[in-house]
Amino acid sequence: MANQKTALKGSEILKNIEDLKKRKFFHLELKGLTKPTRDILSELVNGILDEIGANPLAGFHLFSGLMEALLNAIKANIRHIIFRDELLKKLEQGETSRQDAEELLEIIMETSLLRDAMHRYIVPDKVKKQVQTVLSLEDKIRTKKKVLTESEKVFLSDVRSKIEKYNMNISLKIRITKEELSFRIRNDSPIHHLDFERIQESRQKHKELFDQGNSADFFRPEFLNEKESAGFGIAMIDEGFYSIGLNPLDLLTITSGARTTTVYMKYPISGLKMDF
């Protein structure tokens, strides 16, 4: 974590947590959501909420939304790594050399139009399944539920090494002012253009249901396909905003660049203090 040119590691953050809670700006660089990382974030964010005097229900929805946004960022980075691998396999087919395929891959990954076009050649369910496998294996390690097989260890090690190789991080910035508590979550992978459009459409439909007094209906089975393809995690965050009387379309913004995706979440201090 960096703040005013001070960098602290996890154990140091916990030791200094009472002083840190009084600061107005934080910048954390995350590799994943390990239990120690979750504990640090819980202590820090809930400490800030206590300092603000936030309603416990509002605090619950805020922290749940933040964890969901960070999990989305982690999944996006993993998905990007797996997409790269699958695309490289496609490019190596035929008489293309490994070196030529890798050079072409870099050109594609740096060009949004080419990168988006290549999605049609990669089976989405295959990528999704591998992402879920990575998350499942990480969870088994975290909870010590199961000893991984050799093939599982190799697969997970390969993904981890590529995340390190391509320096795929998650940046979390927290800022507190008199008016609002805001978060900026940035991961090192762009959103596919069509996925971005579907997310926006999905959020609008969710808002329409909320306006009708039925926002929870968005999570019924008839919306299953939309949840899977258009940002179920974002829908969960939006629902948290609705639950505390706030409009997420005004307070949660998603932007995507050539190499990154950024989520901005803003919570008015007055809204966090309200009784529900």
Question: Where are each of the predicted segments found?
Answer:
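Residue-level detector of functional hotspots within protein domains
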Residues: L14-N16, I48, L156-R160, I237
